[in-house]
Amino acid sequence: MDKFTTLEGVAAPLKIINVDTDMIIPKQYLKTIKRTGLGKGLFSEQRYNDDGSENPDFILNKPAYRNAKILVAGDNFGCGSSREHAPWALLDFGIRCVISTSFGDIFYNNCFKNGVLPIRVSQADLDKLFDDAERGSNATVTIDLPAQEIRGPDGGTVKFEIDPFRKHCLINGLDDIGLTLEKKASIDSYEDKAKTERAWA
């Protein structure tokens, strides 16, 4: 998993509440267990028309937001069924941070496990970030994870809270496998001791 320290880029404003995981990545994309290639399915029912052409009105199809790294979204983002493909699709598209007032619990946890930072802010702060994001490619937003701070294009800042353990994992690029490997020396020591003390086992 790639480390996350600071992220600077365009933020796309998605002013829709209750975006569920089926909207993020429709069910037809769930057949694969590969984490790559899912970016094309991100919001596919909104991004594409029935004939496969792009919907020019959808935010991520607008020229200013095609390379967005940050998504500013409405309340209760990622609600609905459990599907780890949702953060996979965001990440494969290039989005590493989602900002909202609240998230679906399972989606929220899955984001951390896959290197995507979900940030909870107040409604007042979200409204300000929407205003910043609507400036398009002229507005760059910076996410500073060590400082737990969002910096807008006008220099304004928004502080956010994050669990210290999850912060440690993101900064050091540690997924579940990485966390296990971080304890490898202790695991090896325990196994060597167990072999000596319980040779009969």
From Swiss-Prot:
Give a Gene Ontology cellular component term annotated to this protein: 3-isopropylmalate dehydratase complex
The record's listing under InterPro entries reads: 3-IsopropMal_deHydase_ssu, Aconitase/3IPM_dehydase_swvl, AconitaseA/IPMdHydase_ssu_swvl, IPMI_Swivel, LeuD
Q: Could you tell me the superkingdom of the organism this chain comes from?
A: Bacteria
The signal peptide, as residue positions, is none
* Keywords on record: Amino-acid biosynthesis, Branched-chain amino acid biosynthesis, Leucine biosynthesis, Lyase
Enzyme Commission designation: 4.2.1.33
- Any stretches that span the bilayer, and where are they? none
Q: Transcription: present as a keyword of the record?
A: no
Q: Name one GO molecular function term.
A: 3-isopropylmalate dehydratase activity
This protein's pathway:
Amino-acid biosynthesis; L-leucine biosynthesis; L-leucine from 3-methyl-2-oxobutanoate: step 2/4
Q: What class of enzyme is it?
A: lyase
**What's its catalytic activity?**
(2R,3S)-3-isopropylmalate = (2S)-2-isopropylmalate
Matches recorded under Gene3D superfamilies: Aconitase, domain 4
Q: Which terms does the UniProt entry file under GO BP?
A: L-leucine biosynthetic process
Primary role: Catalyzes the isomerization between 2-isopropylmalate and 3-isopropylmalate, via the formation of 2-isopropylmaleate.
HAMAP family reported for this sequence: LeuD_type1
Q: Which PANTHER family match?
A: 3-ISOPROPYLMALATE DEHYDRATASE SMALL SUBUNIT, 3-ISOPROPYLMALATE DEHYDRATASE SMALL SUBUNIT 2-RELATED-RELATED
Indicate the quaternary assembly. Answer: Heterodimer of LeuC and LeuD.
**Family according to the record:** Belongs to the LeuD family. LeuD type 1 subfamily.
What is the protein's given name?
3-isopropylmalate dehydratase small subunit
